[in-house]
């Protein structure tokens, strides 16, 4: 079995994430795409939307797609989970012949700082979701995406133009409520 893991904060999920999901399904030779929202990113202090809400949004957006599985492994841990831990968990579950790890190009600069990076690098093939035509190292796969949007922009401005249509209204209401509190 060939699998790909796309983990992320999804705070909120948006058209950029959707572009990565659709491109991965189309361009990668995989049997399963596992989308795994984080409880909290090991490099961040907090999130705006709680893990349950982000998981529900992700499930609503992509849970119905063929070959897609939404996995709650990290959200159930109630702590920051390094990617290597999630990868090892999925190896035990699926014993894949090929394992792709999808990350945004914005993570390339600090990738060497990830927990147990050398081991992680030996277990997966990195696929870089490249939205800014950044030069990708030769040993990584380049997955071109056409959306240049950041979740922080949506949270800060409440501009939901780039939020996936299926959750646009609830995302706007959710972040408006957070800003009022």
From Swiss-Prot:
UniProt-listed PANTHER family: NICOTINATE-NUCLEOTIDE ADENYLYLTRANSFERASE-RELATED, PHOSPHOPANTETHEINE ADENYLYLTRANSFERASE
NCBIfam families: cyt_tran_rel, nicotinate (nicotinamide) nucleotide adenylyltransferase
Reported function: Catalyzes the reversible adenylation of nicotinate mononucleotide (NaMN) to nicotinic acid adenine dinucleotide (NaAD).
Matches recorded under InterPro entries: Cyt_trans-like, NadD/NMNAT, Rossmann-like_a/b/a_fold
Protein known as: Probable nicotinate-nucleotide adenylyltransferase
Membership in a protein family: Belongs to the NadD family.
GO molecular function, one term: ATP binding
EC number: 2.7.7.18
Reactions mediated catalytically: nicotinate beta-D-ribonucleotide + ATP + H(+) = deamido-NAD(+) + diphosphate
Gene3D superfamilies reported for this sequence: HUPs
Pathway: Cofactor biosynthesis; NAD(+) biosynthesis; deamido-NAD(+) from nicotinate D-ribonucleotide: step 1/1
GO biological process entries: NAD biosynthetic process
Entries under Pfam families matching the protein: CTP_transf_like
């Amino acid at each position: 079995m060939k699998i790909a893991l796309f983990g992320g904060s999804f705070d909120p999920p948006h058209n950029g994430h959707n572009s990565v999901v659709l491109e991965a399904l189309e361009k990668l030779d995989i049997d399963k795409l596992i989308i795994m929202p984080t409880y909290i990113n090991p490099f961040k202090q907090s999130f705006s939307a709680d893990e349950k809400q982000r998981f529900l949004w992700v499930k609503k957006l992509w849970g119905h797609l063929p070959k897609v599985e939404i996995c709650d492994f990290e959200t159930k841990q109630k702590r920051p989970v390094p990617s290597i831990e999630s990868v090892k968990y999925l190896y035990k579950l699926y014993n894949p012949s090929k394992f792709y790890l999808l990350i945004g190009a914005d993570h390339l600069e600090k990738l060497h700082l990830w927990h147990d990076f050398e081991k992680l690098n030996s277990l997966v093939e990195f696929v870089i979701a490249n939205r800014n035509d950044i030069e990708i190292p030769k040993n990584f796969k380049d997955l071109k995406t056409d959306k240049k949007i950041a979740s922080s922009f949506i949270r800060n401005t409440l501009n939901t133009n780039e939020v996936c249509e299926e959750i646009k209204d609830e995302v706007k209401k959710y972040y408006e409520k957070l800003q009022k509190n």
